[in-house]
Amino acid sequence: MEPTRDNPLFGGAFSATLPPGAIDVSDLRPVPDHQEVFCHRVTDQSLIVELLELQAHVQGEEAARYHFEDVGGVQEARAVQVETVQPLVLEKLALRGCCQEAWILSGQQQVAKENQQVAKYVTLHQALLRLPQYQTDLLLTFNQPPPENRSSLGPENLSIPPWSLGDFEQLVTSLTLHDPNIFGPE
């Protein structure tokens, strides 16, 4: 089995531990500059790290809900349902020195893939790390499609198991800032 690895993000300004089987989507298609996107080699799971403008008009768990609903709007979700929102313990984060508050949200969105009519429920886990000194909301998303959506999980592909919530938590807690200049001049 392929080990987890520390991966540079945003040109080395950040790094994080990615789970086994993570493929950098920017090697396959264009990805916006404010995002790092990774997909599982076998399943349809994906991990997204986004640098977003701080949404100072929402605070606490409402900020996590705001970003979840915003993602639903961008994806033209037919239904958006928040299941849980909980604070993240800052001491567990590599970014604890610059993260003022952090939230983890789990929910479902009913979305149709590109060029498909049928919308299916996808489970999303999101971590919101708020960095007000950089005017930034860092949003990490773990997309978990339903099992029947997962690409060919035959015996030949069992060497790379589907990602777990633990893999996502490792990404969130290991995310490290190396170069604050990514946020522009202070």
From Swiss-Prot:
Keywords, sorted A to Z: Cell membrane, Cytoplasm, Guanine-nucleotide releasing factor, Membrane, Nucleus, Protein transport, Transport
GO (cellular component) term, any one: plasma membrane
The keyword Protein transport belongs to this UniProt entry's keyword annotation: yes
One Gene Ontology term from the biological process aspect of the record: regulation of membrane depolarization during cardiac muscle cell action potential
Highest rank taxon of the organism: Eukaryota
Signal peptide from the UniProt entry: none
CDD domains per the UniProt record, alphabetical: Mog1
Subcellular location field: Nucleus; Cytoplasm, Perinuclear region; Cytoplasm; Cell membrane
Coiled coil: none
GO MF: guanyl-nucleotide exchange factor activity; small GTPase binding; sodium channel regulator activity; transmembrane transporter binding
Membrane topology summary: Peripheral membrane protein
Stated family: Belongs to the MOG1 family.
Record's subunit section: Monomer. Interacts with RAN, both RAN-GTP and RAN-GDP. Competes with RCC1 for a common binding site on RAN and thereby inhibits RCC1-mediated nucleotide exchange. Forms a complex with RAN-GTP and RANBP1. Interacts with the cytoplasmic loop 2 of SCN5A.
Summary of the function given for this chain in its UniProt record: May regulate the intracellular trafficking of RAN. Promotes guanine nucleotide release from RAN and inhibits binding of new GTP by preventing the binding of the RAN guanine nucleotide exchange factor RCC1. Regulates the levels of GTP-bound RAN in the nucleus, and thereby plays a role in the regulation of RAN-dependent mitotic spindle dynamics. Enhances the expression of SCN5A at the cell membrane in cardiomyocytes.
Protein name: Ran guanine nucleotide release factor
Species for this entry: Bos taurus (Bovine)
Gene name in the database record: RANGRF
